Amino acid sequence: MSKIVKQEENFSKWYTSIIENANLVDYGLVKGTIMFKPYGFAIWKRIQEEFNKILVSLNTAEVCFPMLIPYSEFMKEKEHVEGFNPELFKVSHLGEKKLEDELVIRPTSEISFCNYFKKNIKSYNDLPCILNQWGSVFRVEKNTRPFLRTSEFLWQEQHAVFADKKEAFDFSITMVNEYKKFVNDYLSIAVLMGEKTENERFAGADNTFTIEALMPDGQVLQSATSHYLGTNFAKSYDLKYQTKNNNYDLMFQTSAGLSTRIIGAIIMSHSDNNGLVLPFKIAPIQFAIVTSNEVNKDSDELKAIYKNLFGYKYQTYFVEKSLGLQLQENEIKGIPFQLILGKKEIENNTITIYRRDTREKQNISFKEFNQNFIENLIKEYSSNLFNKTEKRLNSSIEFVNNIDEFKKALDNKKIISAYWSGNAEDEKKLKELTTATPRCFDWNQKIDKTKKCFFTNKPNAKLVYFARAY
């Protein structure tokens, strides 16, 4: 186990050292790939389990599609191709045979889902159709970091088609709201929510909605996105259905996704110089019971603990010598609560509870350790983690009027709020000048004719959030 680098000394190395010490991943054989170790994958499985409940509540059916797509199919949607072309992994040969039509290893699966919809949606009775796939996608990345930017990553991608334009658009809003709620409630991370500007929009979408989380180093992380695709893909792939009037109309389409990037957000948002800190609801081990191997495994004390922890995820560690090393290992793994049952506790008929968020110990009697106490403890833990990120986010937003104030705020690791009416070219110029990008804006916001863009001085501006981003 290597030493954990202090966050305040080198944030990037601190992040990597947390991943190494918590035993989450190893590097793969190909640049930019990672191998999930059991504990790292267990975290992703917990996220998957909990988010699946939300998908089911939205009448989403699960599917699994091939990862290979003919390049000729990819070429049908011009904006999609232009957006992804530099990032594509391609297969040019099958064995020794060179392919006339190369295969793309999916960077996303709109095209596969279009193929499904074309084959299976025949009439208005088949709509809406909402599908989800858990799998991996591939994108060529120059600068890679575990979870944050990898050439292959795991995610869920939901794709849906509707007969009604408003229903489709509203569903894309529903999905970004569900992502925000999930990240707030299950991952204890406060986020900005809004719509992407033209240049930041998903390739082929009419609208992209996003949630953005602020990290302690002042950079933001795009944490999940939802897209209203309109009829862009439907036109390219001839997605039509028979209406009640026996006409044939184009389908309206949406897509949305949450990836293993979110594990990077969890690590950076909550962890400290002592290791990983995990949100309670997605922790693979929520309670670690640490005791001596001299304690009878069928003791009344352990039975009482197990009874009160019914329904939670717990693991018991019977330690041969000092409990200290096991406690430290569990702390590095970010286990929310450790229940210590040493000689002193057994003699006094008490339990010592160690909280990962505050690093504080509390000694209570077995009588006090009941389900009501546990529920309150969990609520307090989750609220504490969320409140820290919410305070960080709210205190980091700064309004600016000009480019000098913009640069100063960036240097101070701020999220910038500013009036903007620039186009895609203006966004590129601003990024070249400052390395910052527009993150999102409130889609319900009305354009103010009296306000001018801080960068171009053009009228009809709206408030947009800017930041440096991962």
From Swiss-Prot:
Annotated compartments: Cytoplasm
UniProt EC number: 6.1.1.15
A UniProt-annotated Pfam family: HGTP_anticodon
Keyword annotations from UniProtKB, A to Z: Aminoacyl-tRNA synthetase, ATP-binding, Cytoplasm, Ligase, Nucleotide-binding, Protein biosynthesis
GO annotation, cellular component aspect: aminoacyl-tRNA synthetase multienzyme complex; cytoplasm
InterPro entries recorded: aa-tRNA-synt_IIb (IPR002314), aa-tRNA-synth_II (IPR006195), aa-tRNA-synth_II/BPL/LPL (IPR045864), Anticodon-bd (IPR004154), Anticodon-bd_dom_sf (IPR036621), Pro-tRNA-ligase_IIa (IPR002316), Pro-tRNA-ligase_IIa_arc-type (IPR004499), Pro-tRNA_ligase_II_C (IPR016061)
GO BP term, example: prolyl-tRNA aminoacylation
One MF term in the entry's GO annotations: ATP binding
Catalytic activity from the UniProt record: tRNA(Pro) + L-proline + ATP = L-prolyl-tRNA(Pro) + AMP + diphosphate
HAMAP family referenced in this protein's UniProt entry, alphabetically: Pro_tRNA_synth_type3
PANTHER family hit by this protein: BIFUNCTIONAL GLUTAMATE_PROLINE--TRNA LIGASE (PTHR43382:SF2), PROLYL-TRNA SYNTHETASE (PTHR43382)
Entry's family note: Belongs to the class-II aminoacyl-tRNA synthetase family. ProS type 3 subfamily.
Domain-related comment: Consists of three domains: the N-terminal catalytic domain, the anticodon-binding domain and the C-terminal extension.
Name this protein carries in UniProt: Proline--tRNA ligase
Organismal lineage: Bacteria, Bacillati, Mycoplasmatota, Mycoplasmoidales, Mycoplasmoidaceae
